[in-house]
Every structure is written in structure tokens, then in C-alpha cells.
Amino acid sequence: MTRNVVRQEFEAPGKPQDSSQQDACLILVKGNWTTNEMEVK
């Protein structure tokens, strides 16, 4: 569910989704996971 929300934020209106946008989403999600891990520690 979170991944869908992030993907919508990265989607540009009127442009088809491409691999570069997907990579950006994955990088953002990984960054969020890293931040959460640091907060737990």
C-alpha cells in the first residue's frame, strides 16, 4: 500500500511510467526503511 502511494507521487501527469521512475520509488522506500531502522536503534 505504501509502495502505491509513493509510486503515485513520482508519476508525472500525462507521462507513462518507466523503469527510472520505478527505480526512484525503490530508492525512496529503501531510504525510508533505513531511517526507520536508525530511529529504532
From Swiss-Prot:
Return the annotated region ranges for Disordered.
1-23
Renumbered to this chain, the Basic and acidic residues biased-composition regions fall at 1-12
Superkingdom, taxonomy of origin: Eukaryota
Q: What is this protein called?
A: Putative uncharacterized protein MGC15705
Naturally occurring in which organism (per UniProt): Homo sapiens
- Give the lineage: Eukaryota, Metazoa, Chordata, Craniata, Vertebrata
